[in-house]
UniProtKB/Swiss-Prot annotation:
Subunit structure and binding partners: The cytochrome bc1 complex contains 11 subunits: 3 respiratory subunits (MT-CYB, CYC1 and UQCRFS1), 2 core proteins (UQCRC1 and UQCRC2) and 6 low-molecular weight proteins (UQCRH/QCR6, UQCRB/QCR7, UQCRQ/QCR8, UQCR10/QCR9, UQCR11/QCR10 and a cleavage product of UQCRFS1). This cytochrome bc1 complex then forms a dimer.
GO biological process, one term: mitochondrial electron transport, ubiquinol to cytochrome c
Protein name, per record: Cytochrome b
Species lineage: Eukaryota, Metazoa, Chordata, Craniata, Vertebrata
Parts of the chain that traverse the membrane: 33-53, 77-98, 113-133, 178-198, 226-246, 288-308, 320-340, 347-367
Needed cofactors: heme b
A single cellular component GO annotation: mitochondrial inner membrane
Localization (cell): Mitochondrion inner membrane
Residues reported to bind a ubiquinone: 201
Keyword Nucleus appears in the UniProt entry: no
Main location: mitochondrion
Binding site for heme b b566: 97, 196
Membrane topology: Multi-pass membrane protein
Amino acid sequence: MTNIRKTHPLIKIINHSFIDLPTPSNISSWWNFGSLLGLCLIIQIMTGLFLSMHYTSDTTTAFSSVTHICRDVNYGWLIRYLHANGASMFFICLFLHVGRGMYYGSYTFMETWNIGVLLLFTIMATAFMGYVLPWGQMSFWGATVITNLLSAIPYIGTTLVEWIWGGFSVDKATLTRFFAFHFILPFIITALVIVHLLFLHETGSNNPTGLNSDADKIPFHPYYTIKDLLGVFILILSLMTLVLFFPDLLGDPDNYTPANPLNTPPHIKPEWYFLFAYAILRSIPNKLGGVLALILSILILALLPFLHTSKQRSLIFRPITQTLYWMLVANLLVLTWIGGQPVEHPFIIIGQLASISYFSIILILMPISGIIEDKLLKWSL
């Protein structure tokens, strides 16, 4: 009798993707984040679905409906905080996943990498629109400030902003369309994830050495299913600790005040996972320049395959670029800190220096160090 797992048209696809998938035998725990991101996406879609059953996308009732979810709906508080903190976990896993890709040279899989960059943009857009929905002070002013950036686009800017708003300010029409987009985008993300995996399985996974591992492959199940399960337990433990003990740790207290267009909060800032990009945006005095720098801070990832100058794929045997990589990580942490600070001395200059070094490390220093390391390797032989 033939095995249904290997013959059934549908089950066969799942089998080749998660069970009999040939996987390098030496991939470390840094390769766990793909499955953790899948889990985060499932958690977000499920909690979001239940929240949408009780939420109303109307400016007069949105804030009250969120309060109603927390107070009156069975385990509504749990669903709400799982969704809010689940987004933070999603971004932690995302940043680690992208960081792993940069360190081990996974960006040489061009199609997989570019779909990944597109996914990052889509997830960021989804998270931004989700932050607007509770209709607190930071929701309203965050939406106003960020959408207003589009007015920097020459000629069509103002028209574009009013078109997105559905009026002359952020109001009922804006909230309704943001809710519609926030609901549909996770399903588009799911489709993109499938394409991301499709391209990945065309080439097979990268590994810490960056070398071809065709000669040493093992089946994904049971080896990596068990390994991924450890990551799943750690993720769930971290998320539940956050939700049950510190649910508001990563949120903004201003968002517990209903949106008021007549009262501007003293410091308008986005969620913590956007602070690095927000710091880059603020570090440029010109509005259009700031917007371009903001977009480029993420889009720069798509340039990585073209900036790769070394003969080696991974950074595992490249000490100079390794040092630059960790400088970049530290730099991003500084940018995240600066993004949450008020626009005053010394934070302005620190933000500008950190922004310059962010682009310098990726665009100039890393490609140069790749060439230097190749030369050193040639001389040492």
